[in-house]
Amino acid sequence: MCVQVMLLAGTETSSTTMEWALSLLLKHPETMHKAWAEINTNVGQARFLDESDLTKLNYLQNVIDETLRLFPPAPLLIPHESSEECTVSGFHVGQGTMLLVNLWTIHRDPKLWVEPESFRPERFGGVEAEGYHYQLLPCGVGRRACPGAALGRRVVGLALGALIQCFEWEKIGESEINMLEEAGIVIPRAEPLEALCKPRQTMINLLYDL
């Protein structure tokens, strides 16, 4: 695989996921506070969180999983091709047929999820996301799953966790945050997210020393 393709795919999907996560957290400040409280308890205020902390930040991981459920970075994954003729759920699939997986629909299917349109990170509490048996598939599954999935989760976890740990976030103005999506292979926000952030008083010295 071309290194340039891997880098572009990794940066675009990760940055899009972080923008959606911040949008959801600004829309649900109580969730933002809960994520910050978890970081404060497990990491403290004397240092920045690092990769080794991520395994202790279960609620932060739940926030990421719920963001990926509602706004999968690649809602149709990548095209696959059937290697042989087959029948799936009564549908004939010829050999060589291009196949797409509609993650957006699967992730919002009321047969699979309680209140599928609601942002509820708690739904993943106490359960590994992979344990949702083909319900949560932001990176595909099996041999052809995204090879950068684990790295992407670490990047998003570290970046999002640092933004929550170090800064207080507020939406700008009284109007609701626009959650409309733009069409594309990756689904970005229709409007770039604008928000107000200021350093947390407890983190100013650490930030100053960077």
What do these predicted ranges mean?
Residues 1-18, 50-53, 57, 86, ...:
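Conserved cytochrome P450 catalytic core segment spanning the I/J/K helices
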Residues 29, 48-90, 110, 117:
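Conserved cytochrome P450 K-helix E-x-x-R motif and the immediately C-terminal K′/meander segment
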Residues 4, 36, 40, 64-72:
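Amphipathic, well-packed alpha-helical segments that form the structural scaffold of globular domains
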Residues 40-42, 134-135, 139-210:
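Cytochrome P450 proximal C-terminal region
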Residues 89, 96, 101-102, 198:
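Generic beta-strand/beta-sheet core signal
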Residues 83-85, 101-128:
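Conserved cytochrome P450 K-helix/beta-meander segment immediately N-terminal to the heme-binding cysteine loop
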Residues 35, 67, 93-96, 119, ...:
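Hydrophobic, well-ordered secondary-structure elements that form the walls
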Residues 13-31, 36-38, 150-166:
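Cytochrome P450 catalytic-core helices
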